[in-house]
Amino acid sequence: MAQEFTFTVNGVERTTTQNKPLLRYLRDDLHIHSAKDGCSEGACGTCTIHVDGAAVKACVLTTALAAGRNIVTVEGLPQDVREAFVYAFGAVGAVQCGFCIPGMVISAKALLDTNPDPSREEAAFAIRNNICRCTGYVKIIDGILLAAKILREGKIPEKKEDFQVGSRVHRIDVAEKVQGYGKYPDDIYVDGMCYGGAVRSQYPRARVLYIRTKEAEELPGVVCVLTAKDIPGQQNVGHIQKDQPTLIGEGEITQYLGDAVALVCARDQETLEKAKKLVRVVYEELPAVYGPEEASAPGAPEVLSLIHI
């Protein structure tokens, strides 16, 4: 009999026999999308959740290790807390793309649970493990401090509705981004949908000698595996010049670490990841260019053959 792992998610007891990253269970099985998958390796903080009240990254915690724990995502926070953060982050302009915001809110709430009146330095320290690529953190810290004030006073200010040119207004999407129900591409789920992913180069510059897809294609649940030879006609893309290959084919040279050499389509995420590992790519590693000085040196490898102005 398979081992069962039981824990509570937002007040509901959940049981699974799968030992996998808790983030994948939350997103794939429960379709809780406030916890974002920004890195899958505990670096960015977009998947931060509460585990027994502490801020924890869900991508590095497994369902086995979560057994017996109380897990809370943004969706499970009390309504007054969510409303306080929605108002505060909207009032100070803390939300831009919004991808990092649910994780920021969770980290901030963990701070306020033990320190309801934090200093600016304490608020900044609380989100030290949460990366934001948009705001520079200043407005997020402003929002945390305002949310703390609102929660201490127990009253959310009324929003000004008589807007005029030049008035400060809240973003119309601030509520969905703070509370995590706004959908990004990775949050979209349709019954029966397939999952796609790229097999990427292990080297910044290398010639692709051989791509073997047979083992991946034979894995149950795999729909198809595509390489450059499956693209009819022009395969280069680009905004100004079409100088970026969609896929690097056999005999061609990669331009950077992570260049795509194959695409895999599967019935589920787990099968997709297994299939990607079964695609065998043989490379001839070539000298790479790591900076402008190397690139401009006599005899430097030519990364792109097109001339850029």
State where each predicted segment sits.
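Signature of N-terminal electron-transfer/Fe-S-associated modules in redox systems
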Residues: M1-K160, Q164
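Flexible, low-hydrophobicity surface segments
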Residues: A148-S305
